[in-house]
Amino acid sequence: MGRFTLKCLKCGREYGQEYRLTCDNDDSLLRADYFEKKLELRDQPGIGRFHSWLPVQEELTTEAGPITYKSEALAKELGLSNLYIGFSGYWPEREALIKTCSFKELEAHPTMQLLKESGGKAIVLASAGNTGRAFAYSSSLTGTDAYIVVPDSGVSSIWLPEEPANSIHLISMTPGNDYTDAINLAGRLAKLPGMVPEGGARNVARREGMGTVMLDAAVTIGKMPDHYFQAVGSGTGGMSAWEASLRLRDDGRFGSKLPKLQLAQNLPFVPMYNAWKAGRREIIPDIDMKDAKKQIEETYATVLTNRAPPYSITGGLYDALVDTDGIMYAITREEALEAKALFESLEGIDILEPSAVAAASLLKAVEAGNVEKDDVILLNIAGGGFKRLKEDFTLFQVEPEVTVSSSEVSLDELKI
């Protein structure tokens, strides 16, 4: 028995339950339409709780899932009475058990499950770091082959809390290549026989997995928040929060007003911020990310750098920002580092670079008067607990099987 259909957001064409990334008629995103219209929590430890709105048949049993708690110390510091933290990482004292320390693991588990249910044998993806680590771990747990392409800056981020399995195939790129180069190489790899592209923002399972941060918050708080803060590189997390909010609104038990997306990019690489500030649906590279590769090298949170984000596409981040009357911020390295130090000292857990950018955007919003004292606010700390994890686990670096110099390299060199 099916649980959902996939619907094109532009032409309305519907597809059955399958691992599908595109509509045959246009380039719009697909969105899952679930037969369960009300969120019924399952008796599972992690994201499997939200099986109602995950595009898989079998319930996920992973302990990895988001947690939501009401902030006291940071909230007091900022003069906020209803600040909630959505935390995805390792913090066992709060029952946060994501051992790759990033909400990207919330994407990986449903994607690998859907791949398995659809008969796929091997997945191909590009990553700036955190996504690759998450899929490598899921590959280790499931035995499903994962071919992961990362730029040199992301190689050190591909570690695991256990011995890497033979199913993980890491392909690194030499310095000078960035995340977008990795995407281009992965796109070529995915055309080889037997390979299935992970799909990025087009992957419905990936978006739904990230959307569980919003679902968990709504269930914990009892309503949707008024504001949602997150740092974005591709924008998929913001889109996921929006889509989850649409379902929560239709459910009828969590309020009717969509959370305002308040999203941040990290200077100097801020193409979506620039386009949004200019009121444009289209990103113009010569204006919005001039000298992009140099900007990316100078960016503190390098995982937030994508030269081809799903901003303009139907159902993409532009639409999400319009629908929620959203705001975007441009955060400096110094602002991120200050926010990181403040958050860690007050909340008592270490956070990753993108989360520091998100925390900085909240500080900026408070200063600018973009939130009221009593508003219900969700700050998505999308990665943290790395230092805490090292207290409990020995970490193993995943070594590249091959290193290539360009996205145009002969695929024969990869020996796949």
Curated annotation (Swiss-Prot):
The modification N6-(pyridoxal phosphate)lysine is found at K104. Signal peptide: none annotated. SUPFAM superfamilies: Tryptophan synthase beta subunit-like PLP-dependent enzymes. It catalyses: O-phospho-L-serine + sulfite + H(+) = L-cysteate + phosphate. Its cofactor is pyridoxal 5'-phosphate. Keywords: Coenzyme M biosynthesis, Pyridoxal phosphate, Transferase. Its EC number is 2.5.1.76. Pathway: Cofactor biosynthesis; coenzyme M biosynthesis. One of its GO terms (biological process) is D-serine biosynthetic process. GO terms for molecular function: ATP binding; cysteate synthase activity; L-serine ammonia-lyase activity; magnesium ion binding; pyridoxal phosphate binding; serine racemase activity; threonine racemase activity. Pyridoxal 5'-phosphate binds at N130. Specifically catalyzes the beta-elimination of phosphate from L-phosphoserine and the beta-addition of sulfite to the dehydroalanine intermediate to produce L-cysteate. Belongs to the threonine synthase family. Cysteate synthase subfamily. Homotrimer. This is Cysteate synthase. It comes from Methanosarcina mazei (strain ATCC BAA-159 / DSM 3647 / Goe1 / Go1 / JCM 11833 / OCM 88).
